[in-house]
C-alpha cells in the first residue's frame, strides 16, 4: 500500500514539475530580453528602415519571441515607430498609461537620462490576452534618434 502511495506521489510531482516548466518557457527571461535589445540595436545601426520593418513584422522571430518584442519611438516627438500593437503606431509613448501609472513618460525619461547606455523601467502591464497588470521590466536604450526597449514579465 505504501509503495502504491509513493508511486502516485512521484507521478503527481512529475506532472506538477512538467506544468511549471512548460509555463516558465511561455515567458521570455531577463537575459533573453536584453539580448533581443542588443540585436535590435545592431539592426538599427546597420539599416534603420529595414530594422523598424523587422520590428513591426510579427512573423520575424528575431524580434518577436513568445511575450518578448521590440518597441521603438522617435526621441524628437515620442511617436511609436515600432510596436506589435498597430493601434499604438504613431501615438506618443509619453501618453501610455496603465491604470494611473504614467508608464510611457517613465520609459521616455529613462531612455533620455540613460542615453546610449541600457536603462531599466519597472512597471505593471497586462500579459497578452489578459487585463490585469503584473510586474514587468523593460530594458531601454537610445539608438540614433530612436528610443527602444524590450520587456519581460517577472
Report the location of each language-model feature.
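N-terminal membrane-sensor/transducer module of prokaryotic signaling receptors
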Residues: 2-154
Amino acid at each position: 500500500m505504501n509503495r502504491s502511495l509513493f508511486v502516485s506521489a512521484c507521478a503527481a510531482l512529475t506532472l506538477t514539475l512538467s506544468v511549471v516548466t512548460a509555463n516558465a518557457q511561455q515567458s521570455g527571461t531577463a537575459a533573453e530580453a536584453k539580448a533581443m535589445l542588443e540585436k535590435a540595436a545592431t539592426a538599427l545601426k546597420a539599416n534603420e528602415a529595414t530594422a523598424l520593418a523587422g520590428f513591426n513584422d510579427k512573423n520575424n522571430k528575431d524580434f518577436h519571441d513568445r511575450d518578448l518584442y521590440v518597441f521603438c519611438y522617435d526621441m524628437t516627438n515620442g511617436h511609436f515607430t515600432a510596436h506589435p500593437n498597430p493601434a499604438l503606431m504613431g501615438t506618443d509613448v509619453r501618453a501610455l498609461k496603465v491604470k494611473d501609472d504614467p508608464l510611457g513618460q517613465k520609459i521616455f525619461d529613462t531612455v533620455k537620462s540613460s542615453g546610449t547606455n541600457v536603462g531599466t523601467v519597472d512597471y505593471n502591464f497586462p500579459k497578452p490576452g489578459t487585463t490585469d497588470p503584473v510586474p514587468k521590466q523593460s530594458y531601454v536604450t537610445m539608438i540614433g534618434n530612436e528610443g527602444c526597449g524590450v520587456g519581460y514579465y517577472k
